[in-house]
Amino acid sequence: MLILISPAKTLDYQSPLPTTRYTLPELLDNSQQLIHEARKLTPPQISSLMRISDKLAGINAARFHDWQPDFTSENARQAILAFKGDVYTGLQAETFSEDDFDFAQQHLRMLSGLYGVLRPLDLMQPYRLEMGIRLENARGKDLYQFWGDIITNKLNEALAAQGDNVVINLASDEYFKSVKPKKLNAEIIKPVFLDEKNGKFKIISFYAKKARGLMSRFIIENRLTKPEQLTGFNSEGYFFDEASSSNGELVFKRYEQR
């Protein structure tokens, strides 16, 4: 079983690390090509392209400039510990045991605009390059054209290595669009998280993102290997709703706190 999650915009390169082990990203040659393109952008162009403030644009221009392919534990940190968005709040990788990291390294992948696919312990230098950004490059007009089949092929390699054909899609639509389902040698299961609001169940972005992290943690902590085991997920008040679910979609609901 291979779990897919999105990266985060918020990064943490200060907190203590629970493990000293690391691996290197497998698609760095591609990352270097994107860095070459990104370095051509001025801070105002970055601000416009990414729809971010001038201050953030300056920070990210400096990150592109400082990025270099020799990754060490001094200039980079493990991806699963560097990302700090809502998904990662639910995941809480900083509390993982070494055995948890082992399982995650085999069964969890982070999709990335710059790195393509990251394993949890892959070192990562700080960056901001969302998958949906229209960064022109030698392969096309955006990052989807740049990555082409590369991400899908890398996921197929991971599935083959574990002798499995199930992908748990906990990534956002923006990121999963970089995967080509018809070329993926897998059954795709998508957990959906609905929260009650004024008597109706709907996707509430903040809660849904955190729930994706909670589900990832549930799979890792319990060493789950079959999709039917996911129905036991009950973290923070969620419960499986079989009636609302279908073959490829597992629906989990949570009642409003009154």
UniProtKB/Swiss-Prot annotation:
Biological process per Gene Ontology, one example term: response to hydroperoxide
Top-level lineage group: Bacteria
InterPro entries: YaaA (IPR005583)
GO CC field: cytosol
The family this protein is said to belong to: Belongs to the UPF0246 family.
Protein name: UPF0246 protein YaaA
Species this chain originates from: Escherichia coli (strain SMS-3-5 / SECEC)
